[in-house]
UniProtKB/Swiss-Prot annotation:
Tissue localization of expression: Expressed in the antennal lobe (at protein level).
GO biological process terms on file: neuropeptide signaling pathway
Keywords: Neuropeptide, Secreted
Gene Ontology cellular component annotations, sorted alphabetically: extracellular region
The protein, known as: Tachykinin-related peptide 6
UniProt keyword Secreted present: yes
Subcellular location: Secreted
Length: 11
């Protein structure tokens, strides 16, 4: 699931 910033959603 993508985080608020979206950088975690990449992994």
């Amino acid at each position: 699931a993508p985080s608020s910033m979206g950088f975690m959603g990449m992994r």
